[in-house]
C-alpha cells in the first residue's frame, strides 16, 4: 500500500465547513415538496445518553438548528438502557450515538448496517443500488478492487443516507519495527446524529 486512502481517492463526502444558505435552500425545497410552511415544522426531539458530554453536543446542535433554520428541538437524555431501547425500536426523531469504523475498512462494520439485509428501526434505510455496490465491494478479489469499490460505496453513502457526522476520535496502533511494506492509520471512531 502506498499512501493514504484519501490521497488515492479524493472526495469530500460532507463539507468540512457549514453553508447556512444551502441548508436553508434544502429546508425550503423539502417544505415545498411536502406542501408545508416553516411554521408547520414540529418540535423535534434529540435522543441521547444521559451524559453531560452528549447533552452538551446536542445543546450545540439545538442552538444551530434554531439559529440557522428556525427549527425548535428538545433534548431527551435517557439512561443507556432506555436510549438503546428507543433507538432500536425507532422511537426517536434524531438520535445521537456512535459507531466504530473497524479495520481494515468500514465495509464489515459500519456500512453493512445500511444494507437492506440489516434492516432495523435504528437505521431504517434500504436502497437496492447501495446493496449492489456494497455486495460488489465485499466480493472484490483484490485489495485494489476492494478499495475502488469501497470508495463507490462510501460516495453513495455520503450522497444518499441521512446521517450527520458530528466529530471523531482516534486511537493508535503499535507494531514491531523492522516490518516493510506495511501501512496503517489510526482507527477512527465517529459520533453521528
Residue ranges and their predicted role:
Residues 60-75:
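Short alpha-helix C-terminal cap/hinge motif
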Residues 39-41, 70, 161-163:
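Short secondary-structure junction motifs
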Residues 52, 75-85:
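Short helix-initiation/N-cap motifs at beta->coil->alpha
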Residues 30-43:
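Short helix/loop segment immediately N-terminal to the Walker
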Residues 1-7, 53-62, 85-193:
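Detector for C-terminal structural segments
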Residues 41-50, 73-76, 93:
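Short, well-ordered beta-strand elements
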Residues 1-30, 51-56:
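Structural transition elements
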Amino acid at each position: 500500500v502506498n499512501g493514504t486512502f484519501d490521497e488515492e481517492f479524493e472526495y469530500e463526502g460532507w463539507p468540512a465547513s457549514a453553508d447556512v444558505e444551502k441548508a436553508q435552500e434544502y429546508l425550503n425545497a423539502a417544505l415545498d415538496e411536502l406542501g408545508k410552511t416553516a411554521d408547520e415544522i414540529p418540535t423535534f426531539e434529540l435522543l441521547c445518553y444521559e451524559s453531560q458530554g452528549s447533552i452538551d453536543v446536542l445543546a450545540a446542535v439545538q442552538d444551530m438548528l434554531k439559529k440557522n433554520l428556525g427549527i425548535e428541538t428538545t433534548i431527551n437524555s435517557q439512561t443507556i438502557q432506555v436510549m438503546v431501547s428507543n433507538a432500536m425500536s425507532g422511537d426517536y426523531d434524531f438520535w445521537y450515538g456512535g459507531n466504530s469504523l473497524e479495520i481494515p475498512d468500514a465495509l464489515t462494520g459500519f456500512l453493512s448496517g445500511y444494507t437492506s439485509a440489516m434492516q432495523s428501526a435504528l437505521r431504517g434505510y434500504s436502497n437496492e443500488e447501495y446493496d449492489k455496490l456494497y455486495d460488489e465491494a465485499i466480493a472484490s478479489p483484490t485489495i485494489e478492487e476492494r478499495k475502488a469499490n469501497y470508495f463507490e460505496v462510501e460516495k453513495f453513502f455520503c450522497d444518499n443516507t441521512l446521517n450527520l457526522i458530528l466529530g471523531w476520535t482516534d486511537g493508535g496502533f503499535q507494531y514491531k519495527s523492522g516490518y516493510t511494506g506495511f501501512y496503517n492509520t489510526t482507527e477512527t471512531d465517529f459520533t453521528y446524529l
